[in-house]
């Protein structure tokens, strides 16, 4: 729906939805279009360079469509910035205490880099990569503290390990008194209705299934190399 249009500037939003359910589509279409209408900016953070490249490609395609639709140049990059967590971590490690200029203000006290929304895509990254990347804690603290007063949107299909930490760290603000921040959670259940489940006793049953469904593509995993080679040989024959 359009509930996102009522998110206040210091709202905390958690979106839990399976991969492929349209989380990034919502940001790049619904939220971005609304942000452009309102003159607001989005900082979109991702955990992998390949994902960043895909999002940039989608944005450029969207620019082309909007230019054709409205007959004028649409400066989409005035309204969205896409970064990886690792880019920020690298700058922090090199001594740049504020790589996004989030805490620098102009003479009127306004941030020189002003964002209304900060999107943490695949936010389980802060937990999943922490065992081998100490930079995750550095970037998490910098980002969440620097953007306490904007809409922070955390998205993941596996957000369970981060959800309690996010709530504990961010659902309050400190001023003259302690008060809770607005908190929103949206959850989409995983639908496995499309899965056709079979229990297989041995390789012969797999071969019979393949023979009866000749037009289907098969991806087979095995925990034994010898059995896997034997099955591959039987399939070829």
Question: In which residue ranges do the predicted regions lie?
Answer:
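SF2 helicase catalytic motif II
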Residues: 100-146, 151
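Walker A/P-loop
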Residues: 9-29
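Conserved P-loop
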Residues: 25-70
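Inter-Walker segment of RecA-like/P-loop motor cores
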Residues: 59-106
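Conserved strand-helix element at the start of the C-terminal RecA-like helicase core
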Residues: 41-52, 209-236
